[in-house]
Amino acid sequence: MLEKYLEISKEVSEALKENKPVVALESTIISHGMPYPKNAETALNVEKIIRDKGAIPATIAILNGKLKVGLTKDEIEYLGKKGKEVVKTSRRDIPFILAKKLDGATTVASTMIVANLAGIKVFGTGGIGGVHRGAQESFDISADLQELANTNVAVVCAGAKSILDIGLTLEYLETQGVPVVGFGTEELPAFYTRKSGFKVDYRVDTAKELAEALKAKWDLGLKGGMVVGNPIPEEYQMDYDTITKAINDAVKEAEEKGIKGKESTPFLLAKVKDITKGKSLEANIQLVYNNVAVASDLAIELSKLNK
């Protein structure tokens, strides 16, 4: 049944059969996260980092109505060039993108779904979605959070994107029973900065310790993922006050223009990039590189435990 929809590359398929470490990657970061050719270059560098670490990258996207797990260089270039013409696809969109045989860029939520269908348990990305500022009125809450509650995939990220309400995001995750872990930190990172002012549930200092906690969670049938907050490397983090002001200005502009829903995150990130004269984009790229390195280590440790 699944073969009709799911196409796993030979390399990824063989790695999974042999219990080799595999790291899932999303494609919204390629189509909506940055301009071409930077987006394709970054995606290929990310794959190289994972390979150098000793794991196998599995970039996930929907191409011509097929859920693809593991993309070729040409497919990554294609997504990079098409950019925002590709539909940003979350859980609710998958059935229609498949039925209409369209191209779709997977978000954190839909990447988790497809990774789980393929049997991949670790996913490295930039930041997760969350509760938007003002959600008390708008109810704008990313589907990523519900996915983390339901789907058994660990997500290594630099925290929640700082354009969000981090406090409310953590409250939501707590209600859903999703552990929020700091990798080498007591505090949840805030994407562009190492600190957010919010404590994590647990601090973990090694990938081995993380893998053991995940194995225990899933062995007990406690469904859902885990948020692994991995701070941006110090030399690339942005000045807290500068980035906070840039975000506040961007949020204000989005409100004035009535930008909401799935359009809001790409708009806010692009605005912050303009305000910071491109510095936020460089920070974004570096934090992704850092996250996939940790995700690779975690995938390696998990595969050892599952031998």
Swiss-Prot record:
What is annotated as the active site?
26, 161
UniProt source species: Clostridium botulinum (strain Langeland / NCTC 10281 / Type F)
- What's an example Gene Ontology biological process for this entry? nucleobase catabolic process
> What gene is behind this protein?
psuG
Entry note: cofactor: Binds 1 Mn(2+) ion per subunit.
Function, as annotated: Catalyzes the reversible cleavage of pseudouridine 5'-phosphate (PsiMP) to ribose 5-phosphate and uracil. Functions biologically in the cleavage direction, as part of a pseudouridine degradation pathway.
> This protein is called what?
Pseudouridine-5'-phosphate glycosidase
Q: Which Gene3D superfamilies match?
A: Indigoidine synthase domain
Q: Which PANTHER family match?
A: CARBOHYDRATE KINASE PFKB DOMAIN-CONTAINING PROTEIN, ZGC:136858
InterPro entries on file: Indigdn_synthA-like, PsuG
Q: Which cofactor does it need?
A: Mn(2+)
Record-listed Mn(2+) binding positions: 140
Q: Does the keyword Cytoplasm apply?
A: no
Primary enzyme class: lyase
The EC designation for this entry is 4.2.1.70
- Molecular function GO labels: hydrolase activity, acting on glycosyl bonds; metal ion binding; pseudouridylate synthase activity
Question: How is the subunit organization of this protein annotated in UniProt?
Answer: Homotrimer.
Q: Identify the Pfam families for this entry.
A: Indigoidine_A
Reactions it catalyzes: D-ribose 5-phosphate + uracil = psi-UMP + H2O
* Record's keyword annotation contains Cell membrane: no
Keywords tagged on the record:
Glycosidase, Hydrolase, Lyase, Manganese, Metal-binding
Q: Name one GO cellular component term.
A: cytoplasm
What protein family is recorded? Belongs to the pseudouridine-5'-phosphate glycosidase family.
Q: Which residues bind substrate?
A: 88, 108, 142-144
